[in-house]
Amino acid sequence: MALLCGLGQVTLRLWVPLPFQSENRIGFLAAGAFLRSGGMEALTTQLGPGREGSSSPNSKQELQPYSGSSALKPNQVGETSLYGVPIVSLVIDGQERLCLAQISNTLLKNYSYNEIHNRRVALGITCVQCTPVQLEILRRAGAMPISSRRCGMITKREAERLCKSFLGEHKPPKLPENFAFDVVHECAWGSRGSFIPARYNSSRAKCIKCGYCSMYFSPNKFIFHSHRTPDAKYTQPDAANFNSWRRHLKLSDKSATDELSHAWEDVKAMFNGGTRKRTFSLQGGGGGGANSGSGGAGKGGAGGGGGPGCGSEMAPGPPPHKSLRCGEDEAAGPPGPPPPHPQRALGLAAAASGPAGPGGPGGSAGVRSYPVIPVPSKGFGLLQKLPPPLFPHPYGFPTAFGLCPKKDDPVLVAGEPKGGPGTGSSGGAGTAAGAGGPGAGHLPPGAGPGPGGGTMFWGHQPSGAAKDAAAVAAAAAAATVYPTFPMFWPAAGSLPVPPYPAAQSQAKAVAAAVAAAAAAAAAAAGGGGPESLDGAEPAKEGSLGTEERCPSALSRGPLDEDGADEALPPSLGPLPPPPPPPARKSSYVSAFRPVVKDAESIAKLYGSAREAYGSGPARGPVPGTGTGGGYVSPDFLSEGSSSYHSASPDVDTADEPEVDVESNRFPDEEGAQDDTEPRAPSTGGGPDGDQPAGPPSVTSSGADGPTDSADGDSPRPRRRLGPPPAIRSAFGDLVADDVVRRTERSPPSGGYELREPCGPLGGPGAAKVYAPERDEHVKSTAVAAALGPAASYLCTPETHEPDKEDNHSTTADDLETRKSFSDQRSVSQPSPANTDRGEDGLTLDVTGTQLVEKDIENLAREELQKLLLEQMELRKKLEREFQSLKDNFQDQMKRELAYREEMVQQLQIVRDTLCNELDQERKARYAIQQKLKEAHDALHHFSCKMLTPRHCTGNCSFKPPLLP
């Protein structure tokens, strides 16, 4: 291989000056590299620049005309494997051609005839029609159905390009550093110029420098630009519309080497429409994604990359932050500004198979992967210029999974310090990591060599190199640019979400160092206690604030609760740690976070994950960690705040669906909002984020309680809290401000009765409104609260809205609360409404009992009766509803069944008629065949008689006509 690499380098150097006889180069290689390495991939690796790289998945290909064209006999049938599918080939005019129809029916069977045709035209692939003989050969070979009337044949190379444009795998052609194609056109008086692939990063990029006037034109304008030289003839172009430039621009060197012409084809195919759908094809790395439509052959990578050539010359002076795209596996999406390590801009390239050229530091396998600092194309520039948060791409654009598939860009990853090929494609990041991390910035943090390590997309851990401290630091820095991995919303199982590697814990230390400040902020902002929770991330998250947020869903900072991803002020403070993948399987009600019905399922869901995060036992997070609160719900708890299993819900909601305190939503509306949000107060993460005394499980995770404004969807600015006091003296002030703050926060909305702040049952906040006789009750609750999750929050309705006079109802409520407590205790399951609220109706017997005993004394009997009646009515109502639902359902079932039977009958009828028709046809056909046969025989005999009576031996029943 070394030899070959060497060779690759040589070719590279020679390449520009003299297009020397392709044949000995290719022939030579063909013998060695090419065949040995099993395919184009290898070839590119050796021929580097010239060839397209991924061009052919595995081909022995048109090298044949060179190496042994003598071997090819006309109409010789062969079989070629294209993307692993055997395709019949036929030698036509000394060239092996593949059967397009067969390709369409196998590899491209998911695309319509039109799509295939249009793409073929766009790629400039001409189809050669078979002769009838060849068609018959193809039928016999099984490539075409017997009924086929014609078949187009395309060369293997064309077939590969066609399939590649559909099936992905877009690497821009590899071209040497300052390469330019010499092109000419003959429209009007013609002109010649240099097409500079490195500048060709969008369909309208001015990438052709006119040879006469040295001005730059886009390809479609260049064909209308001509210089009238003395000897020029005026040619009226047949179809010079702007987009036909691919037809009119030709390489001036007619005898260009194969690779050159192939590279030219690939470049031409680059922005050639075709696939609008690949606009963000995160395919070619950022490449496809970034180019504004990357399109066509999708050679996206190149495109976005700043042009196939991706020559970094093209980068001449863009601010480093345009971040390099590595030509080949392109950086993961346009990274955010990488100030963290400016050297990265070019450094990355080095890492990712360095600009140093084949031999260069990172130079992998001797191929230059031309990183390019794109001259941004439209879409791309847009993405980069917007402060990301305004532009969140649904799938964390920068890295999202488009990158995953390219895990093994063989060329690149080949020689690299395996930063973990895993990250390989992610912008060579892994590789870069090896290189001391300059590239790391490129990756989405998870992917960074550091914590998330190579595992970012592909499960495997980054190898040692990636874990260097340096790398980790870089990763942390990177993290500033990209949020930590869960780039996407908790899309349930579908994403390739690797389990977070253990590497995190190590990374933790370094990252912490890197982002000490951030971490501090984090502690303050308490985005879920990054430290305790997900070891590796603190730094990342903290630092996230400092850089632009990445436009990815993750960027939802603590505050954009509803996933609205509104523009986040960059300093948002740490993100909640990413959801531990295991949890992902749960069925999410909302796209953004689970509405978990009760604490136990939560424990189940996240238990394991949390352990991974080191946040302690399944339930109470480590009491010590101020922030630790029940691990932040992975899916971005409400504002990264309250701990998941908040203490028992406001119990009173048991009876009627109450409007949610914070956001005035009815329970059902709340589905989307994290259920923990209503309970943030209860977790003691009251807006102050003070922790209630007591159960660790309630410690707010540094929460600053939800701060949604009344309608719960415009995130309010986050309050920074001071480090949570370890324990507030019986939650006095907590409740007090809680209550106060909340009152001011949620204006009663329109018609609903707004249940007002829930102070912890009987915390002094509540005490303010109770009659003194409640005091002892209060104490008891304090105790209860201290006991465990059941710090039930009693919502005293309107207590603090002086304008509502029925404060007395506090008692009723209380009572409800109590009651529902007892209910719950007996049922040990959240009562229906609770479930509705999506709250964990987990109650502790202890508390329940205490409450009940204490309060039954305090409850007047009529109140109990009233309650009972309400409950009964409620139950009746529910039963009625249930009944009606059941009836509806049964009706529906009946209707369905009837419908189904009818369908079955109809199908039967259709089938019978079809069968009859078929029989008829068969008979008719048979009759016609008979007639034809008779006619044929008659003709045959007749001609026999006419021409050569002697051939027709006696068995001819035909009488010679009587002569006149």
UniProtKB/Swiss-Prot annotation:
Residue ranges for the region (Disordered) are 45-72, 278-365, 414-461, 525-587, 610-768, 794-842
Where along the chain is composition biased (Gly residues)?
283-310, 356-365, 417-440
Record-level GO BP terms: negative regulation of BMP signaling pathway; negative regulation of DNA-templated transcription
Q: Which InterPro entries match?
A: c-SKI_SMAD4-bd_dom, DNA-bd_dom_put_sf, SAND-like_dom_sf, SKI/SNO/DAC, Ski_DNA-bd_sf, Tscrpt_reg_SKI_SnoN
Q: Which UniProt keywords apply?
A: Coiled coil, Nucleus, Repressor, Transcription, Transcription regulation
Where composition is biased (Low complexity), the residues are 345-355
The primary site where this protein sits is nucleus
Has UniProt tagged this entry with the keyword Coiled coil? yes
Q: Where is the composition biased (Basic and acidic residues)?
A: 798-808
Tell me the CDD domains matching this sequence.
DHD_Skor
Q: Which domain of life is it from?
A: Eukaryota
Family assignment? Belongs to the SKI family.
What protein name does the entry list?
Answer: SKI family transcriptional corepressor 1
Species in which this protein is naturally found: Mus musculus
